[in-house]
Amino acid sequence: LCDRRQRQMCIRDRQEVDGWEKAVNSLLEDSNTDIYVTGSNSKLMSSEISTYLTGRYISIPVFTLSFAEYLEFKKDSGRTPKELLNEYIRMGGFPIVALGNFDERSSYQIVEGIYNSVITSDITKRHNITNFDLFNRVVKYVVENVGKTFSANAIVKFMKGEGRSLSVEAVYNYLEWLEKAFVIYRCQRYDMQGKTVLKTQEKFYLADASLKYCMMGFNPKSVAAMLENIVYFELRRKGYDVYIGKNSTKEIDFVAVRRDERIYVQVCRNLPEESDREVANLLEIKDHYPKYVVTMDELAAGNINGVKIMHLADFLLSKEY
């Protein structure tokens, strides 16, 4: 590192080395080096790195495999993208699962192992959670309600109905810890009339669809919510900030904003013949930004008064938005 040429350095498992930040800061001062630091959340959450590298780092979010990446992993399978989409929806995007040729049961066992490791190391031990059963029930409530708006008060009332005592503050803590461990992702509501982000009735999405299935089992009735989950993360991967759209009394599944760009997205498993809700909600938005309805319906495609209807596979593989 003695000359001034641009170099790259990757530091793995930074949590294993005391004082790693001093070495990184020294390298940033004395060499023309791009440094990539990775590691477990068990000892240092990503959100805490700013205390070590104030103003001197960029956080790069890492998600499970996109559908395009999943296809690359399965390029020798001989199956079409739409055939593999069904597998992607059920199996999720963890690379270790995509690399193997596992059946559904084995895949969910692998994902459950990943989940248990994160919950144990990154959350329960770190935050000294003693009532693991209560914490786990809150997690399951969130998992059962992916893609639905709810509040901390709603969770407290639900727990009370099961004969469990839980404070609103504890719920907020649990949700925050799950977020910081990247198990769940918060999606806030955006008031499209007032142009403001609302702090109530948020939705949460899971880091990967397979997390729901490994805990709750695969249920065809839950697919619609998990399609939303998949689209949410595809928008995040493409660099969008993603919100739930609130327009008077109606809701838009996603308002995605990237600098001066914006798109609106409705997600539905099947597009009914009278597709009024999906399309009409979008047509009420009086601006020039692109509007999409994303569906699993094989026959749904085209354009309705400026609203583009796309199959989920085509949307996930598109580079035009």
Predicted regions and their residues:
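Single conserved hydrophobic/aromatic residue that forms the stacking wall/gate
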Residues: L1-I11
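Short glycine-/polar-rich loops that comprise or flank the Walker A/P-loop
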Residues: R7, T33, T54-I58, D260, ...
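Conserved Walker B
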Residues: D13-V17
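Conserved catalytic/switch belt of AAA+ P-loop NTPases
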Residues: E21-V37, S42, S50-T51
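Interdomain motor-coupling "hinge/lid" segment immediately C-terminal to the ATP-binding subdomain
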Residues: S40-S42, S46-T149, F182-Y185
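Accessory nucleic acid-recognition modules appended to NTPase machines
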Residues: F102-E261
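Catalytic cores of nucleic-acid endonucleases
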Residues: G245-K246, R269-A313
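Conserved beta3 VAIK motif of the Hanks protein kinase fold
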Residues: V265
